[in-house]
Amino acid sequence: MIGKCKAIAHGSTALDYIFREGKLGYRLAFHNLCSREPKAIYEEMKVVSDYNSRCRNKFLRIEIGIAPQDEKKLPVSELMRIAHLFAKRMGLDNHQWVAVTHKDTDNRHIHIIANRISLYRGI
């Protein structure tokens, strides 16, 4: 597996991208979120991120690539576990994040969009 992470300012665009019809595979996790649709998720995250006015790039865009030889061996439950474990090790327990898979390429991958601002207002 290979993970990539970047701080971004355009959380709404990133959420629209990961939920785009034709790309979306499985909805793996919604952490510290009530909403399930991209626009509502963004609004929910924005309420929390607005507490920190100094941070510019308030969202994290994370992609976890699954090795081709492992794709067939990993059921959805294992992909969920991977997403939760990755987020935990990134220190995102007190943050809002959503994880999905994409099916638009030959290689399965997980996308996570996370709020950099925690529920307790820290980064």
For each predicted feature, which ranges?
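N-terminal nicking endonuclease/strand-transfer module with a His-rich metal-binding environment
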Residues: M1-I123
